[in-house]
Design a protein with these regions (language model features):
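Polar/charged, Q/E/K-enriched amphipathic alpha-helical segments with strong coiled-coil propensity
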Residues: 79-88, 106-185
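Generic recognition of well-ordered alpha-helical segments
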Residues: 67-70, 74, 168, 172
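Early exported N-terminus immediately downstream of N-terminal targeting peptides
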Residues: 72-75, 89, 93, 97
């Protein structure tokens, strides 16, 4: 094919040969540019997918874990402090962290990419609903600094009922982070 083109070009005048050669080079360069642009587009899409579903999502899972741990800390403070002002401040912090945790959980859901991640995420979310229901009950019981018996009962409930739920959810969060990291390494 190339030999036939060369023979055809040799039979033409110099001006036509130069014009034909320039046209062939321009077509080859254009084709290469289109091919390179397409390859860059595909790589960009894959890179964006990897960053969104694995790179950034690991940070989002970490933020969800931190705010979840902060809810526990603020819960303990709200039922443990004796100063009414501190109890109110830690209760407000508890509510703020609880909402932030739910917001991060919604962000994490957008990046769930595998069946295993979905299973863990669903376990976390169902456990979190139960945890926050119990934790809210404990905080309401224990934030009245004048009722010592009720505060003691709230502290026992926090230890016996809320703490095991917290541990189970946090373990699932750690597993979700591990699975997400493993999937991202592939």
């Amino acid at each position: 094919m190339i030999q036939a083109m060369v023979k055809k070009l040799n039979g033409k005048r110099l001006r036509q040969r130069i014009s034909s050669a320039i046209l062939i080079v321009a077509i080859l360069v254009s084709f290469s540019g289109i091919l390179g642009g397409t390859a860059m587009l595909v790589m960009g899409i894959q890179y964006h997918y990897a960053l969104t579903n694995y790179g950034f999502s690991q940070g989002d899972i970490g933020k969800m874990m931190i705010t979840f741990a902060d809810t526990r800390s603020n819960l303990r403070a709200a039922i443990g402090y004796q100063d009414k002002t501190l109890v109110q401040e830690t209760y407000e912090a508890y509510e703020t962290k609880k909402q932030a945790c739910k917001d991060y959980a919604a962000t994490v859901e957008e990046t769930v990419a595998s069946a295993e991640e979905r299973k863990l995420y669903d376990q976390i979310m169902s456990g979190m609903e139960d945890y926050f229901t119990s934790a809210d009950k404990v905080v309401q019981m224990g934030k009245d600094v004048t009722n010592i018996d009720q505060r003691n009962q709230a502290q026992r409930l926090a230890k016996d009922e809320v703490a095991p739920k917290y541990e189970a959810i946090y373990d699932n969060m750690v597993q979700l982070l591990d699975v997400n990291t493993s999937e991202g390494d592939k």
